[in-house]
Amino acid sequence: MTTFDFPSVLVPLVGLIFPAMAMASLFLHVQNNKTV
């Protein structure tokens, strides 16, 4: 058990950042198309 366990750090990081970026891009896409 080493302290530098990159996979155990990167997996939740990617699992959180990737959906967050997808949600942000989707939100911006909807905001740009709304034109109300």
From Swiss-Prot:
What is the role of this chain? May help in the organization of the PsaL subunit.
Q: What is the lineage of its organism?
A: Eukaryota, Viridiplantae, Streptophyta, Embryophyta, Tracheophyta
Membrane-related topology note: Single-pass membrane protein
PANTHER family, per the entry? PHOTOSYSTEM I REACTION CENTER SUBUNIT VIII (PTHR35775:SF2), PTHR35775
One Pfam match, given by its short name, reads: PSI_8
Which gene name belongs to this protein? psaI
Which family does the record assign? Answer: Belongs to the PsaI family.
Name this protein carries in UniProt: Photosystem I reaction center subunit VIII
Presence of keyword Cytoplasm: no
Q: Where would you find the membrane-spanning parts of this chain?
A: 8-28
